[in-house]
Curated annotation (Swiss-Prot):
Annotated coiled-coil segments of the chain: none
Organism lineage: Bacteria, Pseudomonadati, Pseudomonadota, Alphaproteobacteria, Hyphomicrobiales
Amino acids binding Zn(2+): H130, H134, E206
Annotated organism of origin: Bartonella bacilliformis (strain ATCC 35685 / KC583 / Herrer 020/F12,63)
Biased segments, Basic residues type: 325-335
Cofactor note (record): Binds 1 zinc ion per subunit.
Protein location: Cell inner membrane
Enzyme Commission code(s) on record: 3.4.24.-
Region: Disordered, residue numbers: 308-343
Protein name per its UniProtKB record: Protease HtpX homolog
Topology with respect to the bilayer: Multi-pass membrane protein
Length: 343
């Protein structure tokens, strides 16, 4: 159902783009618009991941420079039967993360320093599992294409304004009125409709990634707890890169822009409380079906809190990924974690 809906929305956006092209240049304008869309999507297909990672100043890490974070991603990718993605860290205090790449073989995940500092290993696992679900569903490609087409529609709308003004000087009567109507549609209606479609696709894919991510990590409550912590990040911490490039907001697990409100037509993401409620329902279902880890979490008020990854992955002096104090705390409680997450 999600695949069919996404396909229909993408087809609508392409038709909308061609329609704006027709308003600008008639039949030939529609054909040109189709070729432009194809060219932009071709470029985005091959280069969007590099552009976004460079835009946010992402730094690639490995098992030596960021051992625990990298190991979590590796283990989750194995559990999901996905190729090992490239792993990045963004130097930003706002807790957030995103995935990018044209397919599972050329994918990358990125987490902010704020997320690694503020979340526990379990919560980070939930977040990374969500991002891997996006990769598995090829949402990274879908959202890149929708963002590209939406941007192109806005660009054509501005061009239509200039064309419309020129035509009005050389026409009168009904033709002038028709030209004005076409300009209004191209400049305001089409970009607005494209924005709504882009946001609808984004919201649909977030719910699906939450469900699948919970299955990958094995405990929906890890992701629910992470979302609860991250949700206030857009208000508490300023994400300068995201504010300057709002077209990338849909990529993040939670909207990085300030002022994000209710679950509405104008939201890039579903309301966080709705996502958390859905994850709690999924946890209850998994517990009833015999998932021991989830059953323990439900019966004991979510999960047993463990230390975050600040010392392991952000302190260059940490030995083998742990400081002395962090190692003591992790070893003492490590037996409560699932085998794949024990350090």
């Amino acid at each position: 159902m999600n695949i069919m809906r996404t396909t229909m929305l993408l087809a609508f956006m392409t038709a909308l783009f061609m329609g704006v092209g027709y308003l600008v240049g008639g039949g030939s304008g529609m054909v040109v618009a189709l070729f432009i869309a194809g060219g932009l999507n071709f470029f985005s297909y091959w280069n969007s991941d590099k552009i976004v990672l460079r835009m946010y100043g992402a730094r690639e890490v490995d098992e030596h420079s960021s051992p625990v974070y990298y190991r979590i991603v590796t283990k989750l990718a194995q559990r999901a039967s996905l190729p090992q993605p490239k792993v990045y860290i963004i130097n930003n205090a706002q807790p957030n993360a995103f995935a990018t790449g044209r397919d599972p073989q050329n994918a990358a995940v990125a987490a902010s320093t704020g997320l690694l500092k503020q979340l526990s290993a379990e919560e980070i696992s939930g977040v990374m599992a969500h991002e891997l679900a996006h990769i598995e569903h090829r949402d990274t490609l879908t959202m890149t294409l929708t963002a590209t087409i939406a941007g192109a529609i806005s660009m054509l709308g501005n061009f239509a304004l200039l064309m419309g003004m020129g035509r009005q000087r050389n026409s009168s009567g009904n033709s002038q009125g028709a030209g004005m109507l076409g300009t209004v549609i191209a400049l305001f209606v089409a970009p607005f409709a494209a924005m709504l479609v882009q946001m609808a696709i984004s919201r649909t894919r977030e719910y699906a990634a939450d469900r699948r991510g919970a299955e990958i990590c094995g405990n929906p409550l890890w992701l629910a707890s992470a979302l609860s912590k991250i949700s206030g990040g857009g208000q508490t911490f300023y994400n300068e890169e995201a504010e300057h490039n709002p077209a990338t907001a849909h990529m993040f697990i939670v909207n990085p822009l300030r002022g994000e409100g209710a679950d509405s037509l104008f939201s890039t993401h579903p309301a966080t409380e709705n996502r958390i409620a859905a994850l709690h329902k999924q946890a209850e279902k998994m517990a009833k079906e015999g998932n021991k880890g989830t059953k323990f979490a439900v019966e004991n008020g979510l999960y047993r809190k463990h230390g975050n990854l600040e010392d392991e992955d952000l302190n260059p002096e940490a030995q083998n990924g742990f400081t002395h104090n962090q190692k003591k705390k992790t070893v003492r409680r490590g037996k409560d974690r699932p085998t794949w997450l024990r350090h």
